[in-house]
Curated annotation (Swiss-Prot):
Protein name: Cobyric acid synthase
Pfam families: CbiA, GATase_3
Coiled coil regions in record: none
GO biological process: cobalamin biosynthetic process
């Protein structure tokens, strides 16, 4: 192909229609077909973040899409990241670094100034690849945002990207939403839409033909694919809707894991890998839903103090404390690790007006929020050797850190030794455990993608439970990307999509 990559864009009739997973699939298909491909989303509002090798933050979805492309994630793939915080404000990350925290109204005054930043990032990707697959956000028909949006039709028009419009048939009303979206677009914008993708279909696709005929007749835009509802895909999803589904491994499960669904939950895909090794992973938001799990996980959160307040207010805090007192294992990751401690301090009011709050007190630690955020990839080893980490001293771990808090240990024991970051050798401690090893905290996101660590961690729980250990399943996301690509390729007209890609906008 030419020096500047060709473009194709996936927009949707609303949030949660499956844009991210469709972009992931297209990225993998183009890679399978021998092209050098990269994903791009100019502006992403998400709590799921990833840290690149350079230490920059991007949306987790773009990191997944990059992985499907077979390339390392970069900040150019998501130059503007919005991370919602408490009090209707968002932290704005530009080119991987925190830029400011502002309200929604302030952001939409500010956003047009970031268009050049987004386009510069896109152009850098175009110079390095054959194809760039662009993802939109929400809907292009949000007429109240039309003048200030920089993620849907403004990107398509400025960059010259043909658009595939996706709709979710599973929730009903897909034909009304597709026709309504087209009707609300400006005439010039409509000319960019080259085809429809009907996503999340269950049943006999031939039954849709009468409705498809009406859709195509009314809009003069063809339906290019009907993609089935995807189940049991070990691929991280952008939207939290999929948290309602229990994730179980293949075959029988012998461990029950309850993840607390915090209001501002982040990086919830940290635990996908656990479901490949005989564990059921379910997200719970009420005390009555916890039951009697083998492990309670408190996940990451964008706003630790407001979510800690939530745990106290609805009784979840007391339930977790009682369960831990009776021997239930508890794990906290990032914000969840901070919640496990005795106190959380926010002297700079980074998260809210609350400057200090009592934690669960399950670890003898205290966390203080600082002004600077730590964002880095890490690798290291298990240091502690009891309970959840029994017989695992020296086991290699890896992942990435995103946090503004600094946690101080008192009688709690350090859990991990960090030995390397992208900057070179490192020598510092991470995480903490109680003496018995039944309560564990860490700042490392993605720690369970290590097969050996995951096996040892889950088998420690099995030994405590008195059931046989298991060999680790191989968490092969590469295989999952191929599976996704095969399903989507079989469901869409790739010949027509290649025609659209090559013709561009005419």
């Amino acid at each position: 192909m030419n020096a500047m990559a060709k473009l194709i864009m996936v927009q949707g009739t609303s949030s949660n229609v499956g844009k991210s997973i469709l972009v992931t699939a297209l990225c993998r298909i183009f890679k399978q077909d021998g092209y050098k491909v990269a994903p791009f989303k100019s502006q992403n509002m998400a709590l799921n973040a990833f840290v690149t090798q350079e230490g920059g933050e991007i949306g987790r979805a773009q990191a997944v899409q990059a992985e499907a492309c077979g390339i390392a994630p970069s900040v150019d793939m998501n130059p503007i990241l919005m991370k919602p915080e408490a009090d209707s404000k968002s932290q704005i990350v530009v080119n991987g670094k925190v830029d400011r925290t502002i309200s929604a109204r302030e952001y939409y005054e500010y956003a047009p100034l970031l268009l050049d930043t987004a386009l510069a990032a896109l152009n850098r990707l175009r110079e390095q690849n054959d194809i760039v697959v662009i993802e939109g956000a929400g809907s292009p028909a949000e007429i109240n945002l039309r003048q200030r949006e920089i993620v849907n039709m403004r990107i398509a028009k400025t960059a010259g990207a043909p658009v595939l419009l996706a709709g979710d048939i599973d929730r009903g009303g897909v034909f009304a939403s597709l026709i309504g979206t087209i009707d609300l677009l400006e005439p010039e914008e409509r000319s960019y839409v080259k085809g429809y993708l009907i996503n999340k279909f269950r049943g006999d696709a031939s039954l849709l033909k009468p409705a498809i005929d009406v859709l195509e007749d009314r809009t003069s835009i063809p339906v290019l694919g009907i993609i089935p509802y995807l189940r049991n895909m070990a691929i991280a999803q952008e939207d939290s809707v999929y948290l309602d589904e229990c994730k179980s491994g293949l075959g029988e499960t012998d461990l029950d894991i309850a993840v607390i669904r915090l209001p501002r939950i982040s990086n919830y895909d940290d635990f996908d890998a656990l479901a490949t090794d005989g564990a059921s992973v379910r997200f719970v938001s009420k005390t009555g839903e916890i039951g009697n799990p083998d492990l309670i996980i408190i996940p990451g959160t964008k706003s630790t103090i407001p979510d800690m307040e939530y745990l106290w207010q609805n009784g979840l805090a007391e339930t977790i404390i009682k369960k831990a007192g009776k021997g239930t294992h508890v794990l906290g990751v990032c914000g969840g690790y901070q919640i496990l401690g005795k106190m959380i301090y926010d002297p700079h009011k980074t998260e809210s007006e609350t400057t200090e709050l009592k934690g669960l007190g399950l670890l003898d630690t205290e966390t203080t929020f600082e002004k600077e955020k730590s964002t880095t990839q890490v690798s290291g080893q298990v240091r502690f050797n009891n309970g959840l980490l029994a017989d695992m001293a020296g086991c290699e771990v890896g992942g990435y850190e995103i946090h503004m808090g600094r946690t101080r240990l008192f009688t709690a024991q350090p859990a991990f030794q960090i030995t390397k970051t992208p900057k070179g050798p490192a020598d510092y401690l991470d995480g903490a455990s109680n003496a018995e090893g039944t309560v564990l905290g860490t700042y490392i996101h993605g720690i369970f993608e290590s097969d050996s660590f995951r096996r040892g961690f889950l088998n420690a729980i099995r030994r405590y439970k008195g059931i046989p250990e298991r060999q680790a399943g191989y968490f092969d996301r590469d295989k999952e990307y191929d599976k996704l690509a095969d399903i989507v390729r079989a469901s869409i007209d790739m010949n027509k999509i290649y025609d659209i890609l090559n013709e561009g906008i005419r």
